[in-house]
Every structure is written in structure tokens, then in C-alpha cells.
Amino acid sequence: MASTFKITFLGTGGSVPKPGRGLPAIAVQVDNIVNLFDCGEGTQKQFMKSGVSFMNVKNIFISHFHGDHFFGLPGLLSTFSFNGRIDDLNIFGPPGTIDEIKKVLSLIDFKITYNIKIAEMEENKKYDFDLFDVYAIKNDHTKYGYSYKLKEKDLIKINREKADSIGFPKNKLELLRNNGEYYYMGKRYSIWDVADGIKPGRSIVYSGDTRPFNDMLKFASNCDVLIHDSTMDASIENLANEYGHSTARQAAEIALKANVKRLFLFHYSSRYNDLNLLLNEAKSIFNDSYLSREMLEFNVDKKTELIKI
């Protein structure tokens, strides 16, 4: 399992920036791989203020193509080249992503020094990134968009005594773990022959811009961290929903029903100078609710439970 599993909030506002509150961008670091969820205007500058190296960004996931979620791409992609990047970059998003990213690239009038791979993700399909998997589902916004889940791979705990009892060599256990099976002395061994149980991986769900929708309950079920659209407060719920957003109360209701461990409110309307109104509203429903703040880092702890098999 990964040694580092860390969220850094680079921008937490919605639509219009404010001093100290930039546009949506979230870095999720899994060991030395940085995954960027959305890239609002000024994201590259936010990286420079943070403790996260933008040169380690390997994957970018765009939730939808409203400007506040991707206008930071031209600058960031340009700066990669200015800094001599040669490593491949992957950009993922909903249907239409390929055309939108081509438009972004047309704004850059010098040579890109690295290869950019663009992919339109399919709903509910598992995308394998070695240490973790990423899933996407369509949410409920005014523009076609995705919610994302990044889930660390489960760790199969090996029982060395079981291996000894069936005559499987200890120096081949990692090969068995990595491949799921291994042939030794003409006999096929399965990882389950020596497994003691499963340590579940950590998981983060990012809603993107969305009204509340039922599929989120299953998608976010039991996740460690839910980062959810909380654009407005409950007194203007109809307005929030009309514009394809959620209130802090609605985000908390989803967190409660989905049995998540922690909720971070996100994508605040610029009408709010004091965010405690949103926080208190959420906490009245789901106590483990927190405000996302720029440069806030949150390390997701490894799970200690072992699911016996």
C-alpha cells in the first residue's frame, strides 16, 4: 500500500475567485504520483505556494468544462514545458474532453516538450493506475460532468505460516502476491492459498459540481473522504439546485446516508465571506464535516482493520 495518501486543496471557490479563495483544484498525492482534480484559473501559482511539486502531476481529471474548472490548464501545461518536462501527462474527463483539450492546446504557441494523452472516461469502469484505481459516474449539473472516486488497491495480507504448511517458498511470496498465482515445482498456487485476510485501501470521492443525486450514495459508500459541492446554504436551496449545485446541508445529508468517514465542503459561492454558516449547517446533520481551505493538507490514514477470509 502507498506510504503517502494526501489531499492538498489548491482552490476551493466556485465560479468567481476571492482573495484567499481560488478556483477549484485538488491535488491527491499517492506516493510520488500527483493526481490533479480540476484545474481552475491560477492553479499553477497555487502549486507554487503549496508543498506539492506540480512537476509530479501525472494525471489530471477534469470534472466538466465550465471555465472555472479548467481555465488553469493553458498556463500549467505551458509551465511544464518551460521547466523541461519530458514525462507523459494524462488528461481525463467526460465525453467531449478530447475536443476541449485540443482547444486548450491551440492556445499554446510553442513546442510542448512532453507527450499528452487525452482520454474520455467511461462511467463505472475501473481505470487501473497500479497503486490505485479511478472510477467516474455522471453527476447532475447543468453541463455534462463526472464525479470521481480514487481508491487505493486493497492489500492482501499473507500468512507465512500458511505458506510454510503448504510448502510454498517464502522468497516467492511477493511474486505470488503481485501475480495472483505462481507455478512452483509443477504445481499452481493461488494467492488465496496463503492469504490471511484483506486490508481495505483508502478512498476519496470528489463530486464535482452537482445537485444531490441518488447514485452518489452507492458511489461514495463508506469512503474515507467525500469532497462535495457545497456552493450555498439551505436558505437558498432552490437557487443552488437551479444552477446545478448543492447546499452544505444537502452535502451533509449525502455524507450521512453514504456512511462516509469525513466530509469536506467545497466550491463555495463568492457571496460568503464567513464560511461558518455553511460549516454549522453541515455539522448539524453530519458532525464529521469540515471546511476545505486553500493549502489545507489532509493525510488519509491507513486502515487498521483486517477482513478475514
From Swiss-Prot:
Note on how the cofactor is bound: Binds 2 Zn(2+) ions.
Coiled-coil portions: none
Residue numbers binding Zn(2+) 1: 64, 66, 141, 209
Record-listed Zn(2+) 2 binding positions: 68-69, 209, 267
GO terms assigned for molecular function: 3'-tRNA processing endoribonuclease activity; zinc ion binding
**What is its cofactor?**
Zn(2+)
Q: Which Pfam families match?
A: Lactamase_B (PF00753), Lactamase_B_2 (PF12706)
Origin, by domain of life? Archaea
Which residues are catalytic? 68 (proton acceptor)
EC no. given is: 3.1.26.11
Q: Tell me the keywords, alphabetical order.
A: Endonuclease, Hydrolase, Metal-binding, Nuclease, tRNA processing, Zinc
Q: Which InterPro entries match?
A: Metallo-B-lactamas (IPR001279), RibonucZ/Hydroxyglut_hydro (IPR036866), RNase_Z/BN (IPR013471)
Determine if Hydrolase is one of this entry's keywords: yes
Reactions catalysed, as given in the entry: Endonucleolytic cleavage of RNA, removing extra 3' nucleotides from tRNA precursor, generating 3' termini of tRNAs. A 3'-hydroxy group is left at the tRNA terminus and a 5'-phosphoryl group is left at the trailer molecule
Signal peptide (residue range):
none
**Per the similarity annotation, which family is this?**
Belongs to the RNase Z family.
Q: How would you summarize the oligomeric state and partners of this protein?
A: Homodimer.
Query: What role does it play?
Result: Zinc phosphodiesterase, which displays some tRNA 3'-processing endonuclease activity. Probably involved in tRNA maturation, by removing a 3'-trailer from precursor tRNA.
Q: What is this protein called?
A: Ribonuclease Z
Gene name of the record: rnz
